[in-house]
Amino acid sequence: MLFSFSTDFLCFLPELFFGFFSCVSLFFYSFFSGAKQRFIQKTFVLRDISFWLTLQVLFFTLLLLLNNPASYTTFFFGSLSFDIVSFYGKILLFFFILCVFIIGQTYFYIKRINSFEFFVLFSISCLGLCLMTQANDFLSFYVALELQSLCFYALASFKRDSAFSVEAGLKYFVLGAISSGIYLFGCSLLYGTVGTTNFSVFSLFFSNNFVGTIPLSGFVGFFFVIVGFFFKLTAAPFHAWAPDTYEGAPSFVSFFFAVVPKIALLVVFSRILFVCFYSWLFAWSHLLLLVSLFSVFIGALGALAQKKIKRFFVFSSISHVGFIFLAFSNGSFFGLSSAFFYLVIYLFIVFSIWSFFLFF
């Protein structure tokens, strides 16, 4: 956990590049939009510049990820981790971000999204998702999660002339704040039990030799952390915010919500279960099994009663999350690999379906 500038810089280079150019883009857009232009189609020119500049930054960030010479290690005093899971998780994440963004180009033209703020919020939320995949600490994960969530709240209510969209963003904000509070409460209990928030230390502390000596606050804190993840992953019965949010948000934003965030969340969720608390398999396997059964049945039955396509897709995703949790509850490497194989296939299917219905 020592600080080494060269190692930490190499590990963090793609995120540093992406974050730096996101800030540069924000300053450039602000200057360009505030300048007194003589031509009429200034907003349309700004939209084109915003789209292509964001696309190039995403593409070069993916190239940096693929050609990163750093070796697998933890950096920034153990708060972030560069390992095979985070590496392939970020590759998968940016691949689908690029695919979603390219598909959305026509949507931006049709819906006349001419505000550069949309592209800045999109970029910063992608940066938060990228940081989430390599989080090795409960607090670093929370900071990355809030960076992503604050942008998501604004994106969900981006149609300011639609009261339905503003309502969706407000619901998402309120329930997102509640889920973050539940997660932080669990983290505080775990910190009081162990004295740290680092995943690596948790994996050593919560070993089989110490299970009998752990106070009740440790189990309660673990439960609240897991419930916070259930909220974010729209697992039943913590899914109430999702249908209204997806329906009220712009179609491209719902498309983005449905495909990309689950990658980062499931990577961190698997790291917490199989690294920090694997010795508690007897406890969380039954909890995941129960939630997975709830999600499968509520997702399947709830979808039958829907009359709008967005709400139907939301309940479908709830059911699929249940199947992924079912594989997690197995508690073995085969269950974990099966879950991520299912996730990749699910992402391609959802991407294809949303791409078709994006313009309806």
Labelled PLM ranges:
Residues 1-360:
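Alpha-helical transmembrane segments of multi-pass membrane proteins predominantly involved
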